[in-house]
Curated annotation (Swiss-Prot):
Cell location: Cell inner membrane
Superkingdom, natural source: Bacteria
This protein's UniProt keywords: Amino-acid biosynthesis, Cell inner membrane, Cell membrane, Cysteine biosynthesis, Membrane, Sulfate transport, Transmembrane, Transmembrane helix, Transport
Protein task: High affinity, high specificity proton-dependent sulfate transporter, which mediates sulfate uptake. Provides the sulfur source for the cysteine synthesis pathway.
Protein name (record): Sulfate transporter CysZ
GO biological processes: cysteine biosynthetic process; sulfate assimilation
Transmembrane spans: 31-51, 75-95, 151-171, 222-242
Family annotation (InterPro entries): CysZ_sulfate_transptr, Sulfate_CysZ
Family membership: Belongs to the CysZ family.
Main location: membrane
Length: 253
């Protein structure tokens, strides 16, 4: 099926919605199974454990609130919960993406071929195995870019007042951008586009990518829905690649 997508500007919300539609397309579902299983096992177990710990972690986090802000505690408590969900959700989402990276790349490749009618390179289990070292190197590049920035934001959580008010907002914006990078990178990497060049390309449509990443981040925090978010986000990001970036960066057509 050749895509009916156009180059007309679309919002990140549109591409996120497209991900939910594309993930169930005939011929694509079989490439969704492995990423979906990885996400269900890891995110399902992680969030079950998280919800058993919230009654311990939230009071600890609230203990950093200074006395002069105690009158706002009824507002800060939900922010503290959201903060924990954001950090925890992104952390385990990153682990799940590491484990499923080769299969996410294959899903992006097959969906792109279906949307465009292009012929991808010959792939299969041996092709995936051959690409694993390169794919893991790319994941390390993303992690190296992410880690120092995440550490700075996590330190902000320890500053009384700021940690319970400003830090959650900054973390949400950061995680939105990082999740856009994470999922958009699969089709870019399939075409051997360097990591730095990929980030530069995403910045040309920063609002679209922030919208896409923000919705992905929100759904990562929602129990049950977060079990399906990885393949959905891969499909949505691939649709965005086809519309917005493929003409300039594609290696195979």
């Amino acid at each position: 099926m050749v895509s009916s997508f156009t180059s007309a500007p679309r919002s990140g919300f549109y591409y996120f919605a497209q991900g939910w539609k594309l993930v169930s397309q005939p011929g694509i579902r079989r490439f969704v199974i492995l990423p979906l299983l990885v996400n269900i096992l890891l995110m399902g177990g992680a969030f079950w454990w998280l919800f058993t710990q919230l009654d311990v972690w939230i009071p600890t986090l609230m203990s950093y609130v200074p006395d002069w802000l105690q009158w706002l505690s009824y507002l800060l408590w939900p922010l503290a919960v959201i903060s924990v969900l954001l950090v925890f959700g992104y952390f385990f989402s990153t682990i799940a993406n590491w484990i499923a990276a080769p299969f996410n790349g294959l899903l992006a490749e097959q969906l792109e071929a279906r949307l465009t009618g292009a012929t991808p390179p010959d792939t299969g289990i041996f092709g995936i195995m051959k690409d694993v070292p390169r794919i893991m190197k790319r994941e390390w590049q993303k992690f190296a870019w992410y880690l120092p920035r995440a550490i700075v934001l996590l330190i902000l959580y320890l500053i009384p007042g700021i940690g319970q008010t400003v830090a959650p907002v900054l973390w949400f914006l950061f995680s939105a951008w990082m999740l856009a990078i994470q999922y958009c990178d699969y089709p870019f990497d399939n075409h051997k586009v360097p990591f730095k060049e990929m980030r530069t390309a995403l910045r040309t449509r920063k609002i679209t990518n922030m919208q896409f990443g923000a919705l992905t981040s929100l759904f990562t925090m929602i129990p049950l829905l977060n079990l399906f978010i990885m393949p959905v986000a891969v499909c949505g990001a691939t649709a965005m690649w086809v519309d917005c970036y493929r003409d300039k960066h594609a290696m195979w057509r």
